[in-house]
């Protein structure tokens, strides 16, 4: 079990010191009586002395010395004072060497010295050694306590208030050695002890970290000579301090001397009547009490002044003052009592050189800040490595420094299939028209360049083809010469959108290379901080020199003012306020030394001025006037003494703040010995001291706080977490939580892996009685996690951490900000500072890498294993991921790891199965690692996850990943950026890899910049990302930095506009938008700027009139920019503020990777991939897809209930694709893209799907937007999920897929596409799990742990076969298509959107079947119009179409158009909207009972419609000649194709199938494995019935011969369809291959009838001997009229 101390931190051990005699207790009345008597006697003696001396302050120095040595002021006289007189009689010049050495050993010599004021615990000849003792011999690194017999006798205890001689001022023992030993001295404090008003001999060792300057006592010139002589003796040099030590000590001495009359000030150090200042019994701070007691005894002649004035509190306020750097003279120890802190070289930082007068002081504020500002060693090492990396990429290398962007490529299978040839248009300089020709998409770009050059040059042998490039028109992007044309994403998009491929032929010299690095960039040294000024940081800056220097200047100005003016009370208040400002600037850290120093300063300033003047008048040789002006500068001035101590405490805090994050060897060359960690058996321990900077809200809302301390490696705990004690808050300058508790982990340091992390999580217990608590009236809640911080136990040099650390504990509110909240400009996040004290042993502990065995490992043959063992091992190896492995599986895999070399992809599973990563086991693990076959980059990506923290593993993984292409790396860059969080140190192989790729590819550098900039908002890792970003900007070159600066500025401007528009009222938003965009326009007047979304797009100005905003909740902006390339189209993007777009980025990234997987396998699902970029917290930019609308906007054209109708989508596509060829192409695009969307949204668990975040392009491509809910986190409607279906597939989508209301073979194609795409993604299950796992630390609200990945793993069904997965997904399609909940969800959303947009309306309604509007001026006036005839058609349903004969003016031959009854009705309805006050002819819309699509109804409607047209044309010219009527009669492409029908006598097409015949086909998948025959019945098509009605088909099979019909199997029944999809598996088990070769498979398709016998639709008999049962056979089989069982 872990051990936790209850108070001091270390385990208690009995001290061997005898307990000192307790002084007799004195109650309050006795104290008052004694004080009155003492004051009366003192006043009487003073009157006598004053009459004799006459207060002649201008007398000689000798008279003053006599007064100084008078004993009249003491109420008690000690015989030891006689030794002072003897010291004055010594003739220094006549002393021999032996006499000097005798004086050195004289015990009474110390009494001749001037009394010393030990303001702080110090190690010097002039400080009492009662708190110091020699430690016993240490056998361990951190013993539980240092105890042993003291080598010094205990001092006498004086329960008296009277002044004592100098030698006994602080209980100094004159028999103790004058100088301390050169060995380390330990300051010891008690563990648990009651409160004592007299000094104790402590038992807990304590050793100060920093230097401890002292006050040098004032000595006469004679005494100075004497001491100098003594210092030169051999005895002193042998047993005392060396001269070098004396110089160090002298350098610490303040030039502000202590008053020699300090012993005349009475004190009551044994009496403490102030309950506020008394330490608690369970947490006594003896050292601090002794310190306070001694100071107060010198500052107050009247002891009640200190007692009463101490209760006064000075209000703290924020008042900035300019401060001047002053020398300081005192340093305090601000460390925890419970820790041994060894003095290091850092302590010498306090020591400054002597001034010309021979005195010394501590460093000035400027010199200290220069020391603080020095870069730590890890940063310096990182900077050196970046400099080395930069030299590998000289600016002269065109391959790595092209200066322009390369068009990304994607490998695509079956490029040379249909439509393999494309038309290319190339602009060549000197040619007025572009050169156009047709080429094969598989041709390389270099061949295309040669074809283009043939138009320019006759002889290509004289031309350097390699010096030419093809630039994309409208973009600053160049095709890659060594890749085929069709592999470029730009060419693929042009083919997808069916747009012209326009390119431009340029030479390298003519190509814009304005992003290339220059010679100046190569010569500029690397500076990690120089270029970060342009980055907005959402957190408080680390301490820098200039702000703190200003605060220090202000502090010293206030100090100087306080020491000079008469009214010191107000001035001291300003000093304290300045101190508070400094502490606030240092993250609210207020050390114990600062707290105590402020208290003493308050007491000192409240002393009566008469007593202070008395002390000052006795000090120097100046007259009264000089004393009055310079008395405040007197070192004996109590205010001066307190200020000196306060100054020292401030400077100690500065050093602590600056050095807490550094390596122990950073500050100075360590002189410690080094010990290897694997030989260290001590347990890990540290002290949690306090948490600083607590907000007032926490104080009111939380009652107690505690910490959970845990050790982790590879993302798992090494030991059970330890909980600290529960404590409340304290208030000084700021609120703080103080534990001062020792935590001991029962794990030896030798067992700690190098990458061990210490995690400290702060919890708060809610104050249930607090009225401000939001849950005060609710059920009591459990503790809340308030924040967390992690710390590596070994630094980048592999030294174990030691000393005090200030750890920034970021609160949960910062890491999980409220979505939609807009951060105010200038807002700086606050952070809690956790002070943790680690032991500082006498040696540095270093982690050394074990020697790796380079001998060849014996690789075992998997085939030598027993069958059951081999099968078990193969089952584990074939699992998709290590996430599903049990403990038993891991142990088994690790045991058999040497059998797995032939399965290299299983390495992550093997390493994840390692039982531990202790030092003793690393050699064998590393040997296995280095001999393992190289992994593919996407497989090695898993080794960058949190499960693999080992530096050797991660470094080797990066080596394997280096084989990845730049375009693949660009796609996966977000995961690599997140993987930086799992690196234990700043300078890692991963950082080097990313920066090296960024140096060679501008697209990677650009994307990496925006990803790192966005990651700065992750406050826990912001410092690391800041360093990497600084390195990227430093090596990227001046031109790239300038471009990124412009992009950042543009984003800031657009963010400001978006916020203003969002906050404006609805009616004023457009005005605010136009005005605010003027400022953005002024930016473009000075700059051209690349688009952050896509740097190849360059904008030169805004098109303000085209800019608008969307009416959704976030009110995003539509920003339209003019392309800088005149051959390019305008640039449209959406800028959104108030929503976190990082989840959208991740979802779109996953969809893009899926699309690339499909393309590599030859499956083009025509996915719409648009770009999305998070440019900051809750803001970002999204690419707008042109010519697209939401499903809601399309559906509500048919009313609010349009989502329940089947035709809206099909009719909308027909409007934009009027010809049959165009509509068929659009329908095909819809089928493919809808299949891709169904698979992608299901696999990723994308929820909150409604008709406002599903969009349709006019070309038929469907795509999804707004990915706020994913991984199965559904949007709730009360207690119900709004997303009830697996994915969105509605009847109107099925209508487009089928081409009508009934299922067709097109729906079977859709199902096959879905299943094929699903199975291809399933094969990459491990990749998607790894990619999502790496994004867990990104802070996305719905991806926080491994548990969130369970949805994806379950959705992909990794353990099933492809056939089983096909059946599974087919059932999902059926479930989604049959879900009425989706349509209700659409309806609810339609109703909800009415409050934003109302019912759809148009000022100029247009006809749904015509995308444009025409006028009679274009087409000519109509002379005659009539309904000529009607025809029956199938498309695929039977319907009637009416032929309208039109004769226009100036035409001889009439024209014909074809319109349905619904289209006539649409014309009438929209004329009623345009002319609501006009009397229009009545429309024949009477209800028809029964079937409408019959000949009799069509004949009647022909007459009625003809009458309607005659009345319409005879109406007013405003109606008859309006554009809507002209558009109705305008011929469409379908009219031109079908016009011949009207001229023929028999106008029939699309005749129905002939009944009575057998027809159709069935698609089967036949396979055999593990003694089982699998027959998957996939589809049947074109079934024929006798009566022409739609059948209810099902499939039945037998294995013949089968006399008893035991082999009968059948599928489910599909209702009312000629083209059913089954995708059902029929299984025959227990048959060998030999048996099956003698069998035949008989398959029959029948129609199930309820009122009659099932009838036969067709069948087929397949001899199984004709099949290769070792592989799957998928084929269509024609149905025949064969007999069946």
Swiss-Prot record:
Pfam families per UniProt: C2 (PF00168), PI3_PI4_kinase (PF00454), PI3K_C2 (PF00792), PI3K_rbd (PF00794), PI3Ka (PF00613), PX (PF00787)
Polar residues: compositionally biased ranges: 49-60
Keywords noted in UniProt: Acetylation, ATP-binding, Cell membrane, Cytoplasm, Cytoplasmic vesicle, Endocytosis, Exocytosis, Golgi apparatus, Kinase, Lipid metabolism, Membrane, Nucleotide-binding, Nucleus, Phosphoprotein, Transferase
Modified residues (N-acetylalanine): 2
Residues in PI3K-RBD domain copies: 419-507
Stretches assigned to the PI3K/PI4K catalytic domain: 1103-1381
Protein name, UniProt field: Phosphatidylinositol 4-phosphate 3-kinase C2 domain-containing subunit alpha
Source organism: Pongo abelii
Lineage of origin: Eukaryota, Metazoa, Chordata, Craniata, Vertebrata
């Amino acid at each position: 079990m872990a051990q936790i101390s209850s108070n001091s931190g270390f385990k208690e051990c009995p001290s061997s010191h005898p307990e000192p005699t307790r002084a007799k207790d004195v109650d309050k009345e006795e104290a008052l009586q004694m004080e009155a008597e003492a004051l009366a006697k003192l006043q009487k003696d003073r009157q006598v002395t004053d009459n004799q001396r006459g207060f002649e302050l201008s007398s000689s120095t000798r008279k003053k010395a006599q007064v100084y040595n008078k004993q009249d002021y003491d109420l008690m006289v000690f015989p030891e004072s006689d030794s002072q007189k003897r010291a004055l009689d010594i003739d220094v010049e006549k002393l021999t060497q032996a006499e000097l050495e005798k004086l050195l050993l004289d015990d009474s010599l110390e009494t001749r010295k001037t009394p010393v004021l030990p303001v702080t615990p110090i190690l010097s000849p002039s400080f009492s050694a009662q708190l110091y003792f020699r430690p016993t011999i240490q056998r361990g690194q951190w013993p539980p306590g240092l105890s042993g017999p003291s080598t010094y006798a205990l001092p006498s205890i004086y329960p008296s208030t009277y002044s004592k001689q100098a030698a006994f001022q602080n209980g100094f023992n004159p028999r103790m050695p004058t100088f301390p030993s050169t060995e380390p001295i330990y300051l010891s404090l008690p563990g648990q002890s009651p409160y004592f008003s007299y000094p104790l001999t402590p038992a807990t060792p304590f050793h100060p970290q920093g230097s401890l300057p002292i006050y040098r006592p004032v000595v006469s010139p004679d005494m100075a000579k004497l001491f100098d002589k003594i210092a030169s003796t051999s005895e002193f040099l042998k047993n005392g301090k060396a001269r070098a030590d004396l110089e160090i000590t002298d350098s610490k001495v303040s030039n502000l001397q202590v008053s020699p009359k300090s012993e005349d000030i009475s004190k009551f150090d044994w009496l403490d009547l102030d309950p506020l200042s008394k330490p608690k019994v369970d947490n006594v701070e003896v050292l601090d009490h002794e310190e306070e007691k001694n100071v107060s005894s010198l500052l107050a002649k009247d002891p009640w002044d200190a007692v009463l004035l101490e209760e006064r509190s000075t209000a703290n306020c924020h008042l900035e003052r300019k401060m001047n750097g002053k020398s300081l003279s005192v340093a305090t120890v601000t460390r925890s009592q419970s820790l041994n802190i060894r003095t290091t070289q850092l302590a010498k930082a306090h020591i400054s050189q002597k001034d010309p007068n021979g005195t010394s002081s501590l460093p000035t504020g400027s010199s200290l800040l220069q020391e603080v500002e020095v870069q730590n060693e890890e940063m310096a090492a990182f900077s050196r490595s970046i400099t080395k990396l930069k030299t590998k990429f000289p600016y002269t290398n065109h391959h790595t420094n092209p200066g322009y962007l390369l068009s990304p490529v994607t490998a695509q299978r079956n490029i040379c299939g249909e439509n393999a040839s494309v038309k290319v248009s190339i602009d060549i300089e000197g040619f007025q028209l572009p050169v156009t020709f047709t080429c094969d998409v598989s041709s390389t770009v270099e061949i295309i360049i040669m074809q283009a050059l043939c138009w320019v040059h006759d002889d290509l042998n004289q031309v350097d083809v390699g010096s030419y490039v093809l630039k994309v028109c409208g973009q600053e992007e160049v095709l890659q010469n060594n890749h085929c044309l069709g592999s470029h994403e730009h060419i693929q998009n042009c083919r997808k959108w069916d747009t012209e491929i326009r390119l431009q032929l340029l030479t390298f010299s003519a190509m814009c290379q304005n992003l290339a690095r220059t010679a100046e960039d190569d010569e500029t040294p690397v500076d990690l901080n120089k270029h970060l000024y342009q980055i907005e940081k959402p957190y408080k800056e680390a301490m820098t020199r200039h702000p703190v220097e200003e605060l220090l200047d202000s502090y010293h100005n206030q100090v100087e003012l306080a020491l000079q003016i008469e009214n010191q009370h107000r001035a001291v208040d300003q000093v304290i306020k300045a101190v508070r400002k400094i502490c606030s600037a240092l993250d609210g850290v207020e050390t114990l030394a600062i707290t105590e120093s402020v208290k003493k300063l308050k007491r000192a300033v409240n002393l009566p001025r008469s007593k202070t003047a008395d002390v000052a008048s006795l000090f120097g040789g100046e007259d009264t006037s000089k004393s009055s002006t310079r008395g405040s500068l007197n070192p004996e001035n109590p205010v001066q003494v307190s200020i000196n101590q306060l100054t020292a405490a401030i400077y100690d805090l500065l050093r602590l703040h600056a050095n807490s994050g550094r390596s122990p060897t950073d500050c100075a060359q360590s002189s410690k010995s080094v010990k290897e960690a694997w030989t260290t058996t001590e347990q890990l321990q540290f002290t949690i001291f306090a948490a600083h900077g607590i907000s007032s809200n926490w104080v009111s809302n939380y009652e107690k706080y505690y910490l959970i301390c845990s050790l982790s490696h590879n993302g798992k705990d090494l030991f059970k977490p330890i909980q600290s004690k529960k404590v409340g808050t304290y208030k000084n300058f700021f609120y703080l939580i103080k534990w001062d508790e020792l935590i001991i982990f029962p794990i030896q340091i030798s067992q700690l892996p190098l990458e061990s992390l210490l995690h400290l999580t702060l919890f708060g217990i809610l104050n249930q009685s607090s009225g401000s608590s939001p849950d005060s009236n609710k059920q009591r809640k459990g503790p809340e996690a308030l924040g967390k911080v992690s710390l590596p136990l070994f630094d980048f040099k592999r030294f174990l951490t030691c000393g005090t650390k200030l750890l920034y504990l970021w609160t949960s509110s910062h890491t999980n900000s409220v979505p939609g909240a807009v951060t105010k400009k200038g807002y700086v996040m606050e952070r809690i500072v956790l002070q943790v004290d680690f032991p500082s042993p006498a040696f540095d502990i270093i982690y050394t890498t074990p020697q790796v065995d380079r001998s060849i490992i014996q690789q075992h043959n998997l085939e030598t294993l027993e069958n059951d063992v081999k099968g078990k091992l193969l089952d584990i190896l074939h699992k998709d991921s290590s996430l599903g492995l049990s403990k038993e599986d891991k142990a088994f895999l690790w045991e058999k790891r040497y059998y797995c070399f032939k399965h290299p992809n299983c390495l992550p599973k093997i390493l994840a199965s390692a039982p531990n990563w202790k030092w003793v086991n690393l050699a064998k693990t590393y040997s296995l690692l280095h001999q393992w076959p190289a992994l593919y980059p996407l497989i090695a990506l898993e080794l960058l996850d949190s499960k693999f923290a080992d530096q050797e593993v991660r470094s080797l993984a990066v080596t394997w990943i280096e084989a990845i292409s730049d375009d693949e790396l660009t796609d996966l860059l977000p995961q690599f950026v997140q993987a930086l969080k799992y690196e234990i140190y700043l300078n890692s192989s991963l950082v080097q890899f990313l920066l090296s790729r960024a140096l060679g590819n501008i697209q990677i550098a650009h994307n990496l910049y925006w990803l790192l900039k966005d990651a700065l908002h992750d406050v826990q890792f912001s410092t690391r990302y800041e360093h990497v970003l600084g390195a990227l900007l430093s090596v990227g070159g001046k031109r790239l930095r300038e471009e990124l600066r412009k992009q950042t500025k543009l984003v800031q401007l657009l963010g400001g506009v978006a916020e203003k528009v969002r906050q404006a009222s609805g009616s004023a938003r457009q005005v605010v938008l136009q005005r605010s965009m003027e400022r953005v326009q002024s930016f473009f007047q000075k700059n051209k700027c690349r688009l952050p979304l896509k740097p190849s797009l360059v904008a030169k100005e805004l098109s303000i009139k085209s800019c608008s905003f969307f009416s959704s909740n976030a009110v995003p902006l539509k920003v339209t920019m003019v392309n800088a390339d005149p051959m390019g189209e305008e640039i449209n993007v959406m800028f959104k503020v108030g929503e976190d777009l990082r989840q959208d980025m991740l979802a779109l990234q996953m969809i893009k990777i899926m699309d690339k997987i499909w393309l590599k396998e030859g499956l083009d699902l025509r996915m719409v991939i648009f770009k999305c970029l998070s440019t900051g917290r809750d803001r970002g930019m999204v690419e707008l897809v042109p010519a697209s609308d939401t499903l809601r906007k399309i559906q509500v054209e048919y009313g609010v209930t349009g989502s329940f109708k089947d035709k809206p989508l099909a009719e909308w596509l027909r409007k934009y694709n009027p010809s049959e060829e165009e509509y068929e192409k659009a329908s095909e695009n819809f089928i493919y893209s809808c299949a891709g969307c169904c698979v992608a949204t299901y696999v990723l668990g994308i929820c909150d799907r409604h008709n406002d975040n599903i969009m349709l392009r006019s070309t038929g491509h469907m795509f999804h937007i707004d990915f706020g809910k994913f991984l199965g986190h559904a949007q709730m409607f009360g207690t119900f999920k709004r997303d009830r279906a697996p994915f969105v597939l509605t009847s109107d989508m099925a209508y487009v897929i089928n081409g009508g209301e009934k299922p067709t073979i097109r729906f079977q194609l859709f199902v096959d596409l879905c299943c094929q795409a699903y199975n291809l993604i399933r094969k990459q299950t491990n990749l998607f799990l790894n990619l999502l796992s790496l994004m867990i630390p990104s802070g996305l609200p719905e991806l926080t742990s491994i548990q969130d990945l369970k949805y994806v793993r379950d959705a992909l069904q990794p353990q099933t076969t492809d056939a089983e997965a096909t059946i599974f997904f087919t059932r999902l399609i059926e479930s989604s298509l049959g879900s009425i909940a989706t349509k209700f969800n659409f309806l609810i959303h339609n109703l909800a959107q009415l409050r934003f947009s109302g019912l759809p309306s148009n000022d100029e309604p247009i006809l749904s079947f015509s995308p444009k509007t025409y006028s009679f001026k274009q087409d000519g006036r109509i002379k005659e119009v009539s309904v000529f005839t009607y025809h029956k058609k199938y498309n695929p349903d039977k319907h009637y179409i009416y032929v309208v004969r039109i004769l226009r003016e100036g035409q001889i031959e009439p024209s014909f158009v074809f319109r349905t009854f619904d289209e006539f009705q649409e014309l009438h309805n929209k004329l009623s909207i345009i002319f609501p006050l006009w009397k229009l002819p009545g429309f024949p819309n009477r209800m028809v009972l029964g079937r409408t699509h019959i000949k009799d109804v069509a004949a009647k409607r022909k007459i009625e419609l003809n009458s309607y047209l005659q009345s319409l044309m005879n109406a007013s010219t405003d109606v008859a000649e309006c554009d809507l009527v002209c558009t109705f009669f305008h011929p469409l492409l379908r009219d031109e194709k079908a016009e011949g029908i009207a001229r023929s006598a028999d106008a029939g097409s699309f005749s129905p199938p002939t009944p009575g015949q057998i027809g159709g086909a069935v698609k089967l998948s036949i396979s055999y494995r593990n003694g089982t025959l699998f027959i998957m019945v996939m589809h049947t098509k074109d079934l024929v019935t006798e009566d022409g009605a739609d059948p209810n088909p099902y499939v039945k099979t037998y294995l013949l011969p089968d006399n008893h019909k035991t082999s009968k199997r059948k599928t489910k029944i599909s209702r009312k369809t000629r083209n059913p999809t089954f995708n059902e598996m029929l299984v025959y088990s227990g048959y060998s291959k030999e048996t099956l070769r003698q069998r035949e498979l008989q398959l029959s398709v029948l129609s199930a009838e309820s009122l009659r016998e099932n009838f036969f639709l067709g069948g087929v008999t397949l001899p199984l001997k004709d099949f290769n049962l070792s592989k799957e056979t998928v084929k269509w089989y024609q149905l025949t009229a064969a007999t069946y069982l």
